[in-house]
Amino acid sequence: MLHPVVAFGKMISFSEHLLNKGQNRKLKGALAAIVLVLAIYFVASYLFRWVASSSPGGFLTLQILAIFFCLAGTTLVREVRMVFEAVDRSLEEGRKQVARIVGRDTSELSAQEVRTAALETLAENLSDGVIAPLFWYILLGVPGMLAYKMVNTLDSMIGYRNERYRDFGCFAARLDDVANYIPARLTAFLMILAFPRGGFWNLLKFVGMYGNQHASPNSGYPEAALAGILNCRFGGPHNYFGEEVWKPYIGSNGRLLTTEDMKIAVSVNRRAEGIMIIILIITITLVSFFI
């Protein structure tokens, strides 16, 4: 069975190959993104209505499969664990392992930078890989969740500021920012609620202070929540394949990160996911009761 995200990737690649040329690339990119997202939403809506009317059991099975395919939490947790295990063995192994989950040059990273990159990615993934899909499922059902995954896949494939995608992927990147605006902040809140080490209100203030320091309008919030919980510092200079990019620091304690920090970060993720699932179950129960 073809994974939906793989299918989305093929659709995006086809659209990009067809349209990312000549004049009006911004307009073409915007139209491609809008058509793809709306197509996924309406096709999924029609399909699920048809299945629900003909086979309630099949409808439930299809919903479960869609949710399973749209969530991306377990795989990254495993990868982050492997990064910490690898860097404990050797710096070179750690660099190679973290390269699997980050989009930057890892060949010159220090051990601290390897661990930092892994934890930053873990925090970001909790938002766009777990909390955001469930958020859109609560709002718009499986079609909304699938449409969100298309938005997220568009951003990951063409939402770059390089020469090839600067114009064509501009709208996709902004659309992803909008789709993740509430989920990113909700993720930070759930992380603090799940693991209020250092004090719930202190952590909220910390996120309020550092959450908007990131270049992304959204990624800084879950990163700030994790940095506050761990009492550490994220951000700083990064090498993106020959180009040095400075990311503002999130937090002020530049202490060395350890395997224990990774274990706490994983626990934070799992607890936040659990709270979101409880919210989902309560919402479904209330909707079923009143409809």
Predicted regions and their residues:
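Hydrophobic alpha-helical transmembrane segments
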Residues: M1-L146, G159-I291
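Active-site His/Glu-centered metal-binding helix of metallohydrolases
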Residues: M150, L154, I158
